[in-house]
Each structure stands twice: as C-alpha cells, then as structure tokens.
Regions:
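Helix-to-beta-strand junctions that scaffold the AdoMet/dcAdoMet cofactor pocket
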Residues: 63-64
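Short, glycine/polar-rich helix-capping loops at beta-to-alpha or helix-loop-helix junctions
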Residues: 6-16, 78-83, 103-104
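Rossmann-fold dehydrogenase core element
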Residues: 68-70, 81-121
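Short glycine-rich anion-binding loops that position phosphate/pyrophosphate groups of nucleotides
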Residues: 51-53, 75-76, 151
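Conserved acidic donor-binding loop of glycosyltransferase catalytic domains
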Residues: 5, 28, 70-72, 96
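C-terminal hydrophobic helical "lid"/dimerization subdomain
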Residues: 57, 101-159
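Adenosine-nucleotide cofactor-binding segment
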Residues: 1-56
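Cofactor-binding loop segments of dinucleotide-utilizing enzymes, especially the Rossmann-like FAD-
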Residues: 6-7, 74, 98, 149
Length: 159
C-alpha cells in the first residue's frame, strides 16, 4: 500500500501512514505522484479521496496498464484525462458516492477478521461549534464524536 499526501504533509503524517501499514509515502508537493508510482511499478488501483479534481487528473499516469482510479472525493471541477492514457494502457476512472449494503457488510467483516478499530477523537458536547469548525477546515483527525459530561455519545431520540 502506498499513501499519497496532498496537504498537511510532514513527518507526523508520514509516521502515521507507516504505522497504519503504508509501504511507501509520497508527498505530492515534493514530488510528482504519477512519476513516483511508476518508479514503484505503477499502481493497480488508486483510491482518490482528496477533494481536488486537479490532483485526480494527474493520478492516471501513476497506474500500471489495466489499472483504475476510483474517485470518492469531489470538488465539482472537471477531471482532465487524455484518451491515449485510457485506451493504450487500458486504464479507467470510476466514481462512487457510497458503497452498497453488501460492501458495508464485507468491510465490517474484514475489519473484524483483521482486528481493525476506528480512530476516534472525542469532543465535549459544549465544544460542538469548535469541533464543527475544525471539521469544515479539514483539521479533524479521522472521526469526531461529541460526548456528554458522562463521556457517552448520544444521538437524537427516534420518535
């Protein structure tokens, strides 16, 4: 697995990526991700989570023949790709807004088998506005959960 970081890069981000299982870390501001991926043999699949159409456009060149870019992050802008890259190397670009119910079940089953646990940042309910602002600014670390004074996360009643 290779991690390509597009923003908020740095030593702490690289250390986290390696701790989470990355074999390679590519800082897109320091190097060309497509060129670096090709030097590593090319990617079979690139999961593009960044909300940047411009960065998605540059990823196709990092694929090996037959590879695919799956775009799940969006900003509403166009993704520019050349037909030569698609046809001659049999590469593809796909998009998905959410997986199917079966995808969710498969993901949870895989998580149980691999003992994968979510990384959660808890925030007191009184700091909800600050937590929301951090989320909007892209400063939230993984998932943020609002908790009450007793430390319990609560949702709205279902009536």
């Amino acid at each position: 697995m290779t991690i390509i970081c597009e923003r908020d890069h740095g030593q702490s981000k690289q250390e986290l990526a390696v701790r989470l299982g990355a074999h390679h870390y590519i800082d897109s501001e320091a190097t060309d991700p497509a060129k670096t991926l090709q030097q590593l043999g090319g990617a079979t699949v690139i999961l593009a989570t960044a909300s940047s159409s411009k960065s998605h456009s540059g990823l196709l060149g990092g694929l090996r023949p037959g590879g695919s870019v799956l775009v799940v992050g969006l900003d509403g802008g166009p993704i520019e790709i050349g037909s030569t890259d698609l046809v001659l190397s049999e590469r593809s670009v796909d998009g998905s807004k959410i997986g199917s119910a079966q995808d969710g079940e498969d993901t949870l089953a895989f998580s149980v088998l691999q003992n994968i646990r979510p990384m959660i940042e808890t925030v007191p309910l009184e700091q909800a506005a600050d937590a929301y602002a951090r989320m909007i600014q892209g400063k939230a670390r993984f998932r943020m959960v609002l908790v009450t004074k007793d430390g319990v996360a609560q949702g709205a009643p279902l009536n």
